[in-house]
A protein has these predicted regions:
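Ligand-binding clefts of soluble mixed alpha/beta catalytic domains
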Residues: 94-96, 102, 110-113, 122-124
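Short glycine-rich anion-binding loops that position phosphate/pyrophosphate groups of nucleotides
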Residues: 42, 105-108
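Residue-level signal for pocket-adjacent positions within structured domains
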Residues: 78, 88, 109, 122-123
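ATP-dependent carboxylate/acyl-activation modules
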Residues: 1-35, 42, 55-63, 113-124
Length: 124
């Protein structure tokens, strides 16, 4: 899913995007572990945006029970096993996520550009 296509996706759209991105990743040999990203990890923060990502993750889990999904997660909890052990030790995704669902265009584009610059990779 391209975060520039859905500028402010709804919870339902985010759930569908998670499935579509995971299926696409499988074509590239990726065993998807999906993290719905937020400024909160499993209720550590409060707000409308947190609720949106938590609800979207719950919808995706309900619709696609075979897909490993967690949310809402902060990026560090999503990718760092050390942080995940502290923030969400019972998660099957935290600390090993490889498929990221961003809440909107601001978060998605900025994070992709950040990763591109730091890694030297080109992201189309």
């Amino acid at each position: 899913g391209d975060c520039a296509i859905n500028l402010k996706p709804t919870e339902d759209q985010l759930a569908e995007i998670a499935w579509e991105v995971a299926e696409c990743g499988k074509h590239f040999g990726i065993d998807p572990k999906v993290a719905f990203l937020s400024y909160s990890t499993l209720g550590s923060g409060k707000g409308e945006d947190v609720d949106k990502m938590r609800n979207a993750a719950a919808k995706a889990k309900e619709l696609y029970p075979s897909l490993p999904i967690e949310g809402e997660l902060q990026f560090d909890a999503a990718v760092s096993p050390r942080v995940a052990r502290t923030k969400c030790p019972n998660s099957e995704v935290a600390g090993q996520a490889n498929t990221f669902i961003f809440p909107d265009i601001n978060a998605g584009v900025e994070d992709c550009l950040y990763a591109s610059v730091l890694s030297g990779a080109w992201i189309c």
